[in-house]
């Protein structure tokens, strides 16, 4: 039954995306940019409804008060395709730095360009990267939320952190707050899998790390606060969802955390 529900959800998920893009594209490009953003945000909301109704997966967001009204860097853990879109409805005007090749995709690329997403050639250096930074500064000055995944790629729940220093350079150069975000959607929507699992989890938006720190100090603090919250949520999520099949990385990390608790008495 779970395989059937997963198949049904996956089918409707992509059908929902394709139909909305085709049907709503004319309206999307007529509307002003910020108003048009409600179309992808409503797509995200509809996906939450599909996942709740078909699979039985729900979530809650804590710490929305930690999102500033000024420009900021939003720095979530990255475990699943889910976290690439799920928080769009909770952010006023998010912007991504994307591989430039994504902008070449019909419909998707057009949508992204309308929302002033920032394209980057990952092989580029020098002047090209300076242009990316200038674009990022423009969007920060407009009060937008720059979404950056500090580890760069999807990591399974409980995996050893592999943060990339690029976010420290952005923190130094953009001089805006960084908002760490901990969550474990990868337990319910695993990477490289078509299975979807029912249950409930939390997304925890942590207090801002304000600008002005030395980049090395910032980088260590980002890792420390994010991983501490991530460990807490891992234990809580597994305790509240005992039916979940856990990846080896989560099993190992839970054993390590429980061992520390035992040693601490």
What is each of the regions a protein language model found here?
Residues 4-29:
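A hydrophobic membrane-anchoring feature enriched in long, contiguous, low-charge segments
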Residues 1-8, 258, 265:
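N-terminal hydrophobic signal-anchor/signal peptide
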Residues 61, 118-121, 211:
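Short acidic-hydrophobic, aromatic-tinged amphipathic segments that line or gate anion-handling sites
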Residues 21-41, 45, 52-54, 69-125:
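Catalytic core of membrane glycerolipid acyltransferases/transacylases, capturing the structured
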Residues 63-67:
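Glycine-rich helix-loop-beta junction characteristic of Rossmann-like nucleotide cofactor-binding loops
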Residues 130-265:
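Non-catalytic C-terminal accessory region of glycerolipid acyltransferases
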Residues 61, 74, 96-97, 203-205:
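Generic preference for hydrophobic
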């Amino acid at each position: 039954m779970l395989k059937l529900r997963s198949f049904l959800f996956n089918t409707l998920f992509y059908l929902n995306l394709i139909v909305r893009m085709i049907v709503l594209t004319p309206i999307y490009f007529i509307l002003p940019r910020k108003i048009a953003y409600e179309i992808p945000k409503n797509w995200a909301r509809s996906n939450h409804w599909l996942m709740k109704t078909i699979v039985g997966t729900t979530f809650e967001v804590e710490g929305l008060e930690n999102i500033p009204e000024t420009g900021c860097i939003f720095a979530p853990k990255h475990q699943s395709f889910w976290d690439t879109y799920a928080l769009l409805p909770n952010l006023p005007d998010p912007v991504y730095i994307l591989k430039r090749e994504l902008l070449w995709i019909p419909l998707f690329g057009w949508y992204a360009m309308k929302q002033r997403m920032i394209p980057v050639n990952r092989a580029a250096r020098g002047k090209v990267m300076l242009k990316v930074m200038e674009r990022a500064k423009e969007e920060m000055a407009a009060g937008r939320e720059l979404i950056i995944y500090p580890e760069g790629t999807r990591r399974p729940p409980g995996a050893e952190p592999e943060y990339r220093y690029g976010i420290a350079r952005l923190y130094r150069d953009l001089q805006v707050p960084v908002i760490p975000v901990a969550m474990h959607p990868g337990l319910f929507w695993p990477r490289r899998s078509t299975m979807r699992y029912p249950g409930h989890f939390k997304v925890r938006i942590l207090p801002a790390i304000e600008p002005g720190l030395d980049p090395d100090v910032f980088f260590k603090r980002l890792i420390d606060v994010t991983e501490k919250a991530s460990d807490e949520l891992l234990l809580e999520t597994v305790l509240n969802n005992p039916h979940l099949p856990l990846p080896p990385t989560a099993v190992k990390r839970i054993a390590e955390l429980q061992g520390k608790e035992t040693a601490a008495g």
